[in-house]
């Protein structure tokens, strides 16, 4: 005979949800910070190819 599984408590569900949301918030903050540094030209971790005009 089929027996229903034990139900997990709401506090465990809420804790998992909070951890997941926290990780997403940290990732979003890093992405915004990286975008700001690239836009202002202060990014240290990127190497951009410099396009030089050739004079003939």
From Swiss-Prot:
SUPFAM superfamilies: Zn-binding ribosomal proteins. InterPro entries: Ribosomal_bL32, Ribosomal_bL32_plant/cyanobact, Ribosomal_zn-bd. Keywords: Ribonucleoprotein, Ribosomal protein. GO terms for molecular function: structural constituent of ribosome. The keyword Ribonucleoprotein applies. The keyword Ribonucleoprotein applies. Pfam families: Ribosomal_L32p (PF01783). GO terms for cellular component: large ribosomal subunit. Residues 1-21 are annotated as: Disordered. GO terms for biological process: translation. Residues 1-20 have a biased composition (Basic residues). Belongs to the bacterial ribosomal protein bL32 family. PANTHER family: 50S RIBOSOMAL PROTEIN L32, CHLOROPLASTIC (PTHR36083), LARGE RIBOSOMAL SUBUNIT PROTEIN BL32C (PTHR36083:SF1). This is Large ribosomal subunit protein bL32. The gene is rpmF.
């Amino acid at each position: 005979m089929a027996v229903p599984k034990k139900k997990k408590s709401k506090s465990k569900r809420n804790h998992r949800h909070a951890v997941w949301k926290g990780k997403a918030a940290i990732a979003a903050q890093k992405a915004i910070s990286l975008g700001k540094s690239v836009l202002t030209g202060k990014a240290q971790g990127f190497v951009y190819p410099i396009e030089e005009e050739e004079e003939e």
